Structure formats: structure tokens, C-alpha cells
């Protein structure tokens, strides 16, 4: 991907008192480059329980490519593309929620747990232009990861074997 049409990407997850904070951080790291720092803020919930907010902001192009590459493994990329009018707000921010438990296992799918907010480059900075830029990017990602035959994405071939087995 030669250019990245985002100004930055924010990722955030909550580690509740019943969860292992390290596992939540590991789930968040599924989407982050190795050198990304995770910010930690400890809060107290309404009933006095501990809630830790783990977040990271990626602002450099290589880091954003890493995040996008991880998101390209989403099974529901076509669904996200179809819902872009609802997922991009008037401030040109694209919102996704990915499954925290699946991310901990190294899988990428839509669901609760990790919020992804990407500020889409759009000139003029209007929602329709941002939707179109996000659509082009996600379509390109989907096309480049859609054949399922590259060992890098850990996918399987039609017969269920991995590319290394073929």
C-alpha cells in the first residue's frame, strides 16, 4: 500500500477487574506494530471496581499500514464497506469494534472489546469524501488479502490445508 489515507489510528480496550490486564494488552497488540507503546489509565467503575483503559495512537505511515494489514484479515470487510456511511462520522473518523477475545487468539473479527478509530484524510474534510477514501482503501485491502493463499495471513486453502502444507 503506497499511501495511507489516514491521519492517525487510535485503538482502545478496557480491562475490567475480572480480566487479566496482560491478556487484554496482548489482544490490543494484535493490531499494533512491535514498537508501539500502550498507554494505561486506571479508573474506578460505578460500583468501585477497577477498570484499566489501554490505548495506543499510531501516527506514522508504517504503523498505520501494520494496523490496516491486521484489519485486512477481517472476514466481514465487505460488511464494513457496505456500512461505511454509518461508520464514518461528520468529523471524518472511521469507527470499528473488533472482538477482544478473538484478537487475543490472533483472529480478527467484528465484535465487542476493542475500539478502532481512524481519522480519514479527506479534502475537502467532508463525510462523503472520507467515506469514498475509506471505501477505496478497504476495497484495496480486501482485494490484496482476498485470495487466502498467502502464508503471512495464516489462512487455509480450499482443502483446509495451510499454504505451507501444499
Task: Report the location of each language-model feature.
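Long, hydrophobic N-terminal alpha-helical segment
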Residues: 1-37
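Short glycine-/aliphatic-rich beta-strand segments at the starts of folded cytosolic domains
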Residues: 7-14, 94, 116-120
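Beta-strand elements of well-folded, non-transmembrane domains
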Residues: 13-17, 32, 60-62, 100-102, ...
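Short amphipathic alpha-helices in soluble, non-transmembrane regions
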Residues: 24-27, 67-74, 134-135
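Acidic, Ser/Thr- and Gly-enriched intrinsically disordered low-complexity segments
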Residues: 31, 53, 64-72
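Short, charge-patterned binding micro-sites
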Residues: 38-63
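Mid-chain, well-packed structural core segment of small domains
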Residues: 69-104
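Glycine-rich, aromatic-bearing surface loops/beta-hairpins
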Residues: 96-166
Amino acid at each position: 500500500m503506497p499511501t495511507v489515507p489516514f491521519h492517525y489510528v487510535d485503538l482502545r480496550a478496557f480491562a475490567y477487574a475480572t480480566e487479566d490486564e496482560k491478556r487484554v494488552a496482548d489482544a490490543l497488540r494484535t493490531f499494533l506494530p512491535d514498537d508501539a507503546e500502550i498507554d494505561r489509565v486506571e479508573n474506578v467503575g460505578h460500583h468501585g471496581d477497577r477498570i484499566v483503559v489501554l490505548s495506543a495512537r499510531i501516527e506514522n505511515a508504517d504503523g498505520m499500514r501494520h494496523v490496516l494489514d491486521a484489519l485486512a484479515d477481517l472476514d466481514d470487510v465487505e460488511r464494513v464497506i457496505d456500512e461505511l456511511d454509518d461508520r464514518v462520522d461528520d468529523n471524518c473518523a472511521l469507527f470499528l469494534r473488533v472482538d477482544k477475545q478473538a484478537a487475543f487468539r490472533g483472529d480478527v473479527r467484528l465484535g465487542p472489546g476493542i475500539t478502532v478509530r481512524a481519522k480519514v484524510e479527506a479534502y475537502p474534510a467532508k463525510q462523503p469524501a472520507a467515506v469514498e477514501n475509506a471505501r477505496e482503501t478497504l476495497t484495496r485491502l480486501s482485494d490484496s488479502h482476498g485470495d487466502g493463499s498467502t502464508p503471512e495471513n495464516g489462512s487455509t486453502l480450499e482443502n483446509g490445508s495451510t499454504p505451507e502444507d501444499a
